[in-house]
Amino acid sequence: MQLRWTQRGMMWLGALLTLLLCSSLKGQENSFTINSIHMQILPHSTVQNGENLTLQCLVDVSTTSRVKPLHQVLFYKDDVLLHNVSSRRNTESYLIPHVRVCDSGRYKCNVILNNKEKTTPEYEVWVKGVSDPRVTLDKKEVIEGGVVVVNCSVPEEKAPVHFTIEKFELNIRGAKKKREKTSQNQNFVTLEFTVEEQDRTIRFQCQAKIFSGSNVESSRPIQSDLVTVRESFSNPKFHIIPEGKVMEGDDLQVKCTVQVTHQAQSFPEIIIQKDREIVAHNSLSSEAVYSVMATTEHNGNYTCKVEASRISKVSSVVVNVTELFSKPKLESSATHLDQGEDLNLLCSIPGAPPANFTIQKGGMTVSQTQNFTKRVSEWDSGLYTCVAGVGRVFKRSNTVQITVCEMLSKPSIFHDSRSEVIKGQTIEVSCQSVNGTAPIFYQLSNTSKPVANQSVGSNKPAIFRVKPTKDVEYCCSADNCHSHSKMFSEVLRVKVIAPVDEAQLVVLKGEVEPGEPIVFYCSVNEGSFPITYKFYKEKESKPFYQDTINATQIMWHKTTASKEYEGQYYCTASNRANLSKHVIQSNTLTVRVYLPLEKGLIAVVVIGVIIVTLVLGAKCYFLKKAKAKQMPVEMSRPAVPLLNSNNEKTLSDAGTEADRHYGYNEDVGNHAMKPLNENKEPLTLDVEYTEVEVTSPEPHQGLGTKGTETETVYSEIRKADPDFVENRYSRTEGSLDGS
């Protein structure tokens, strides 16, 4: 019993110790670190297509634990996860068997231990070469023109793949046909190749190319099985009948034959050509025939083409036909004849063999002999040929153009204007020869000077458009192929009327007194007679005088003028060349009728206005001058004489200065004012200003009595050079008479 309690106590003690140990271990966590990580590529980073590739990830981890921690190893290609494994080992491997181009790329290894991780650098792997493609054909025997389907694939590679397929003839170097195609989504292509007529035994070759980054990897060229080609028909053959020498007049037969195999589904088309022209063809049998009577025109190269769908075979032969007689020659005594002359035609054959002759004009027979003679008319113009025959052979000669020219009739000349011709107006002058062979050459002349030329291809009139500016005489000449000299028409006289141009009104005297005459002249620069003149007073619709005369000027006068004739006047001029809306109007003139008293008053007013204007101008000038200098000098004395440019006079001179305005000389009363700068003083003269007290007489006193009223006057004194006379200009404030 005691022993049982002892054993039970020991068990509890062991359990207690275990708990204590575990709690102690839990209180102390293990520490770890990833010292390094490295990746190896075996056998090396550049491998041939089909080899095995091993990626090794080497990890060095340090820890305080007696047991190596469990870490996670990840393999990446181009940042895409390839393999993931949890391990306690230092080295983990990943095998890629039979690498292909698609396995080229950048590889790296990543290690994760709890919350710590480390990654290796990226390693470039390059797979060289492409696996051999597979070439398959849909048939091993084919007829000419048939189609062979070629399939080329690289099953172990990934798209896109660029395929090149070539067709070769057995025992012949160089490809007969080459085709290329890129398959974007599949690792194979299927292409059709047509079998041509020259193919006998053919094979196909395929090569694959894949783009890997900046590199292009290519496979070995792989050849297909041999394909046997059967003919659908033979090459064409020619048969010429008669054999040997072929003479003109013989029956010529050109035959082309071909042999068709039993594998052909239908007959091919047989075509016979002579110098590109198809002369015979057949698609219902194995031959085509061209039959004709032989002439020298059938000499040449003949070609036979046999065509069926995609197949075409060609054969050629040269046919020589011996000439029986030469081509006839047609000769004429002349090719251009005047009407009434004799035409002589002669047809001959070199060597002069016996033959039958026919002379034709435009397809109609005019003679059945070698010679043809006739006195010609215009209707005999045309094309002449000669036909010579020996047996069944007929030959046509050269063509001769005969032109018979009819003499022209005297041309007539006329124009279309039914009324008078106005200067500058366009008129149509026509010239026509009713009889004569065309073309006819017309020339329009003006007093022996050519104006225009025109050729007409018929007997219709030639129309010339002219613009005469004065009376003119026209004549036209006509000429054609006839040997006669030119024919001249009569003279056509064209009368041209000129419209009135620029009217002008002139008055003999624009200002008249009552009882004096008023005389108007209305004239024009140019215009055909008669001219109608009309005189108008302004604002009146009807003329007060009009007349039609044969002159470029007209006068109207009124012997005694009165006040009612005062106003504005104008005139108009027109002739039959002026349209109603284009009447020429002159300038406008004003006529004034004055009484003698009015005339004197007007003169006085005009003179007064001139004097006032000059006084105001001088006053403004001196005021501006005084303000500009601003150098007033004051002085006073009883009376100072005023000086002008010519004389010195006192302001108190009776009868001479009392009624005179200042700033003018004595000649003002004679309507002549002397300019202030008469002595042409230089602009640099010194100027002095003096204040002067002037005594003026009382208004009610006479000019000889001295008044007691004084005025202040500013005097400007200029100092001149010794060579000049001293000029003094005086101005007073107000007038001398107190007004």
Swiss-Prot record:
Membrane topology, Cytoplasmic segments: 619-739
SMART domains for this protein: IG
Residues on Extracellular side: 28-599
Modified residues (Phosphotyrosine): 689, 714
Short motif ITIM motif 1, span: 687-692
Biological processes, Gene Ontology terms: cell surface receptor signaling pathway; cell-cell adhesion via plasma-membrane adhesion molecules; cellular response to mechanical stimulus; immune response; positive regulation of MAPK cascade
Glycosylation sites: 52, 84, 151, 301, 320, 356, 371, 435, 446, 453, 550, 578
Highest taxon above the source species: Eukaryota
Signal peptide as annotated in the record: 1-27
Residue ranges of the TM segments: 600-618
Region annotation (May play a role in cytoprotective signaling) ranges: 722-739
Positions carrying Phosphoserine: 730, 735
A Pfam family recorded for this sequence: Ig_C17orf99
PROSITE patterns (UniProt xref): IG_LIKE (PS50835)
Disulfide bonds: 57-109, 152-206, 256-304, 347-386, 431-476, 522-571
Principal location class: membrane
InterPro entries: Ig-like_dom, Ig-like_dom_sf, Ig-like_fold, Ig_Fc_receptor, Ig_sub, IL-40-like_Ig
GO molecular function terms listed in the Swiss-Prot or TrEMBL record: transmembrane signaling receptor activity
Keyword Glycoprotein in record: yes
Subcellular location: Cell membrane; Membrane raft; Cell junction
Lipidation (S-palmitoyl cysteine): 620
Domain Ig-like C2-type: 35-120, 145-213, 236-315, 328-403, 424-493, 499-590
Subunit structure of this chain's protein: Trans-homodimer (via Ig-like C2-type 1 and Ig-like C2-type 2 domains); trans-homodimerization is required for cell-cell interaction. Forms a complex with BDKRB2 and GNAQ. Interacts with BDKRB2 and GNAQ. Interacts with PTPN11; Tyr-714 is critical for PTPN11 recruitment. Interacts with FER. Interacts with CD177; the interaction is Ca(2+)-dependent; the interaction is direct.
Protein task: Cell adhesion molecule which is required for leukocyte transendothelial migration (TEM) under most inflammatory conditions. Tyr-689 plays a critical role in TEM and is required for efficient trafficking of PECAM1 to and from the lateral border recycling compartment (LBRC) and is also essential for the LBRC membrane to be targeted around migrating leukocytes. Trans-homophilic interaction may play a role in endothelial cell-cell adhesion via cell junctions. Heterophilic interaction with CD177 plays a role in transendothelial migration of neutrophils.
Name of the protein described by the UniProt record: Platelet endothelial cell adhesion molecule
Species in which this protein is naturally found: Bos taurus
